[in-house]
Amino acid sequence: MGRRSRAAEIQVPWQATFAPLLAGRTLPARALAAVLLLALSAACGSRLPESDFEHDDRTPPPRDSAPLRVGIIASATSPVGGSAFTGPRDGAKAWFDRLNARGGIDGRRVEVRLCDDGGSGVGNNECVHQLVEEDEVVALVATTVLDYAGASRVSGARVPDIGGQPIGSAYDTYPHLYGIYGSLAPRDGTTGWDGKQYGSTEVYRYFKREHGARTAAVVSYNQSASAAYARLVERGLRAEGYRVVTEQVDFALPNFRAVAADLKEQGADLVFDAIDGHGNARLCQAMDEVGADVTAKVTNVQNWTSTVPEAYRDSPRCRNALWATGSSRNHQDTGHPAVREFRDATKGLKTHSQWQLEGWAAARWFTDAAKSCARTGITRACVDAYMNRSEGYTAGGLLLPVEFKRLAEPPKTTRTCLSVARWQDGKGWVGQGDMNRTCFDVPQLAYEP
């Protein structure tokens, strides 16, 4: 089985609203175990007289009972929309609520400090200042923001940022930042390798191998960032041998019916896009109206939600052709104990999503790190050291194995695994095979964020 970690997604401003399908993927890492140094130092040094050990009445230091503060930054009121960035926050908060109900970490309650940065760089810096410098949080968890302008300040303060969503390039740029999918980049202050990041083609390989897809369409707006992202998707598809059909619509007055008619004419097997959620719903409706049936209308983890029936209510055929891909276990896979625990704790939420599950996994990751530090003291440095040692972390099976390793050169190929689900009315998101066995050896393609 190929283990892997995932680096930042393709980074363009539109990534927050359309499917980032040429995801940056990286291989597993193996870090030095800092605990060995501690063990060696304990075995060296001056020898004490035996009498010093005969009557040791010393008591251990009193256990700290003060709450552990963690921060969650989410662009809850961003221009993109009120719920676009709140899934990871809600999942993480649900984890901490359940954790506190069970006694917290080593008897200490976790105090969650929330901050909405409004989707702006100024707001993000204000949140970082409040949480890192004023509230003195031990760590940030499940960061999900449109503009991570304060990332360098978080890194400079050596505050571990655990399980954040790689909407920007920060998680492939700075030390002490640990994205939910991992990273192989040097993370020395320069993005990726000499300013370039790398994405791989496992999504395209999957549909070619498993479903015989040969023709893929990519739909974008006539807007620079949308078009740039579409070109990246097209490049990945061509690398996998697809015939690529490009479709562009006017951002202000999109004619989705014309696009749908051409998709039917061209015989597209797959449809990828660089458009927003509302545009996707209108595209699907147009596809149903003209009878453009496809093997898969492919979306990503951000749109892997229970709101599909409402969002695509006017397009039943296209709705049932929706497929989602990602790096975490399907949030409807209640046959898995870790998913059952997540669903039980979040049953009060109106909707469920893959981003909620990944936020839950991020909070669990922090908890595992903090528990490892309980004996010596739960500090930023100790939690950060645990994260640096992370090797194949899965959050109890919720994630594909995640690791961090600073490679001097980018890998040319990777062994990459994939979680896949498709929507079916009456069943919801139905998993397609074992994510730990749906693996491919694929090329890495360079891009500039």
Residue spans for each PLM region:
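Bacterial signal peptide processing site
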Residues: 44-48
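Sec-dependent bacterial lipoprotein signal peptides
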Residues: 2-42
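Extracellular/periplasmic periplasmic-binding protein-like sensory domains
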Residues: 182-186, 287-361, 435-448
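Segments of small-molecule ligand-sensing domains
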Residues: 348-356, 367-430
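Beta-alpha junction/loop-to-helix N-cap segments that form part of ligand/metal-binding clefts
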Residues: 53-56, 83-87, 103-176, 250-256
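Extracytoplasmic "Venus flytrap"
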Residues: 52-93, 117-122, 220-227, 351-357
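Extracytoplasmic ligand/sensor domains, especially the bilobed periplasmic-binding protein
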Residues: 137-248, 295-318
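Signal peptide-proximal N-terminal region
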Residues: 90-112, 239-241
